């Protein structure tokens, strides 16, 4: 009897909450529809896999940080381009006043429809972010960067004045306001951040990010991006080998890493990443300098194979789909259910590939190999 009275009291409380705050303000978790996490692809298949859900999650706060010239803005611009290609509206808050529209265009960004703001101070920037997010019309908003969100008091004050904790308080207040609106409108906010060094640290990493601790707590995903190698064509530097570590992830297991190439003037090399992932997962076979996919030679050397995939986007999409299916990333449950043998079918060519002698494969695809080599 007591249990029944408690249930009646709970039902009455739930009904009162709904009347006062609206339908959906409180509910049993079992009554909530569990929809798959919507994502925005990053432009790198390896990073999409490392994130565990196939890209940057919608409706969340994301922080991208790293040293100077490590690829932070490039990575973010690829996400902007992918959001626009899916029909989404994107805003870019350029607090650094350093966005290069020509470079953004080369990465696939539709600069004519990109909403751009170059605010005068941090309060103005975050107020603009709040208003745009609450409009419910955006899919992605980028803030570049947290370090450039200078409080109004600091701008109006003298050069030597001390303003301890002003920026941290500003960020904390802004994140408290926008986090709920981001989730309700399914808008992703990407904050680009810079690194600073703490003085007097004897043990552990002296590196820290700007803007206080609030962003660390509110971010669902934090990406640490680093340049690990310079790519060269002869003696000329043509790009960077980049490593991204997922240091925080609330939507999938964290601490995974991804490596990919960023080519100067071109951005992330999607095709280069597909070749690396294809070899790693057995879909692309590497014999000496030659790269082969299902009996067809892609080219001699990674650069030729990369160009071949760039000229054949359908083939690149096919390889990407098989990689994601095998790793269970970016595939909805209903797709897996309708294609139960997809993984086995896609893995079959990779298993069979080593049994095929290299000379036979070369003869079968002589014309393609010649084209790729040239």
Curated annotation (Swiss-Prot):
ATP binds at residues 66-73. The keyword Nucleotide-binding applies. GO terms for molecular function: ATP binding; ATP hydrolysis activity; ATP-dependent DNA damage sensor activity; damaged DNA binding; single-stranded DNA binding. It is found in: Cytoplasm. One of its GO terms (cellular component) is cytoplasm. Keywords: ATP-binding, Cytoplasm, DNA damage, DNA recombination, DNA repair, DNA-binding, Nucleotide-binding, SOS response. Gene3D superfamilies: P-loop containing nucleotide triphosphate hydrolases. Signal peptide: none annotated. It holds the Pfam family RecA_C. GO terms for biological process: DNA recombination; DNA repair; SOS response. Transmembrane segments: none annotated. Residues 338-374 have a biased composition (Low complexity). Residues 326-374 are annotated as: Disordered. Its main location: cytoplasm. It comes from the Bacteria. Belongs to the RecA family. Can catalyze the hydrolysis of ATP in the presence of single-stranded DNA, the ATP-dependent uptake of single-stranded DNA by duplex DNA, and the ATP-dependent hybridization of homologous single-stranded DNAs. It interacts with LexA causing its activation and leading to its autocatalytic cleavage. This is Protein RecA. It comes from Streptomyces coelicolor (strain ATCC BAA-471 / A3(2) / M145).
């Amino acid at each position: 009897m007591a249990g029944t009275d408690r249930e009646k009291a709970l039902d009455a409380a739930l009904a009162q909450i709904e009347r006062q705050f609206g339908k959906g303000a409180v509910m049993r978790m079992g009554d909530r529809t569990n929809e798959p996490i919507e994502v925005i692809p990053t432009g790198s298949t390896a990073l999409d896999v490392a994130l565990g859900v196939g890209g940057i999650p919608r409706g969340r706060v994301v922080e991208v940080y790293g040293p100077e010239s490590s690829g932070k803005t490039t990575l973010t611009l690829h996400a902007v381009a992918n959001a626009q290609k899916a029909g989404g509206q994107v805003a870019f808050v350029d607090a650094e006043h350093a966005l290069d529209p020509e470079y953004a265009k080369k990465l696939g960004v539709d600069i004519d429809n990109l909403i751009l703001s170059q605010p005068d101070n941090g309060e103005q920037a975050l107020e603009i972010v709040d208003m745009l997010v609450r409009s419910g019309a955006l899919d992605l908003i980028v803030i570049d960067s947290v370090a450039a969100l200078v409080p109004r008091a600091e701008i109006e004050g003298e050069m030597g004045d001390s303003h301890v904790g002003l920026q941290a308080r500003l960020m904390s207040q802004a994140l408290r306001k926008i986090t709920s609106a981001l989730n309700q409108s399914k808008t992703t906010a990407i904050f680009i951040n810079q690194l600073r060094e703490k003085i007097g640290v004897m043990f552990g990493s002296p590196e820290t990010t700007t803007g206080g601790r609030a962003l660390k707590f509110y971010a669902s995903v934090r990406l640490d991006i680093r340049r690990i190698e310079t790519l060269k064509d002869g003696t000329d530097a043509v790009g960077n080998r980049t490593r991204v570590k997922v240091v925080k992830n609330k939507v999938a297991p964290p601490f995974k890493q991804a490596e990919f190439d960023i080519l100067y003037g071109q951005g992330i090399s999607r095709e280069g990443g597909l070749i690396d992932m294809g070899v790693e997962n057995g879909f692309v076979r590497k014999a000496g300098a030659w790269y082969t996919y299902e009996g067809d030679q892609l080219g001699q050397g990674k650069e030729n194979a990369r160009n071949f995939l760039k000229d054949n986007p359908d083939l690149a999409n096919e390889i990407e789909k098989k990689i994601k299916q095998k790793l269970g990333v970016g595939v909805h449950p209903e797709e897996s259910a309708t294609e139960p043998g997809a993984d086995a079918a896609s893995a079959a060519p990779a298993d069979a590939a080593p049994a095929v002698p290299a000379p036979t494969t070369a003869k079968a695809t002589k014309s393609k190999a010649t084209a790729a080599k040239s």
